[in-house]
């Protein structure tokens, strides 16, 4: 399947056009399981960037990756019901759950309740809260780095390991106490989220002692 057909679907997903997305899936059910064959390259950066979710589309990404990143609560279960692989890894090793925990506190598209619900739905369907990408990064690392406390809470409740070190030796707690360099991480909303994340991690770690 060409990237073009899948791109048409994911464009409708990020713009929240559920009616058209459902129509495309009904007309071509294979799209639910399809993966991008090429994805972003240096020459195609503009084509494969999804501004609505702040993500590039990489080779190996699926519609579920994009729906998870957009917290689409109708599309995510639909794709899963149609056979989408919740453990699908893109060329960087990221699974849909890695995308679901990303966010930008204070941005107009940021929706903590929808994000937490998306995380829970993916885990219910078999996603691993301790899955690692090629950099050893877990969903918890990403949720902490992007200052998404609701996602952190959902992951911890599902068994995410706050002591796991990525390939650089960083644990989620270390990332929680540092400036991540992520765009928007210095905003007042992000700082409030950071304080809540540190509290969540400390409480979780204390219960494990």
Language-model features: locations:
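Ankyrin-repeat boundary/"N-cap" motif
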Residues: 3-11, 34-63, 89-106, 132-138, ...
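Internal alpha-helical scaffold/solenoid segments in large eukaryotic proteins
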Residues: 73, 83, 139-152, 157
């Amino acid at each position: 399947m060409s990237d073009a057909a899948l791109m048409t679907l994911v464009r409708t997903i990020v713009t929240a056009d559920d009616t058209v997305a459902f129509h495309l899936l009904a007309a071509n059910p294979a799209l639910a399981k399809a993966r991008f064959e090429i994805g972003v390259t240096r020459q195609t950066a503009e084509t494969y960037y999804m501004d609505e979710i702040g993500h590039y589309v990489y080779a190996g990404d699926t519609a579920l990756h994009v729906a998870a990143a957009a917290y689409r609560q109708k599309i995510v279960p639909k794709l899963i019901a149609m056979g989408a692989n919740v453990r699908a890894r893109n060329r960087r090793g990221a699974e849909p759950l890695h995308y679901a925990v990303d966010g930008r506190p204070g941005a107009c598209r940021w929706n903590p309740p929808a994000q937490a619900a998306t995380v829970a739905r993916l885990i219910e369907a078999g996603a691993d809260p301790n899955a690692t990408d090629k950099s050893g990064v877990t969903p918890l690392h990403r949720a902490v780095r992007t200052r998404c406390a609701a996602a952190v809470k959902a992951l911890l409740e599902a068994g995410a390991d706050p002591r796991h070190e990525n390939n650089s030796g960083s644990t989620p707690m270390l990332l929680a106490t540092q400036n991540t360099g992520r765009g928007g991480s210095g905003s007042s909303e992000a700082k409030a989220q950071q304080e809540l994340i540190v509290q969540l991690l400390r409480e979780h770690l204390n219960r494990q002692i």
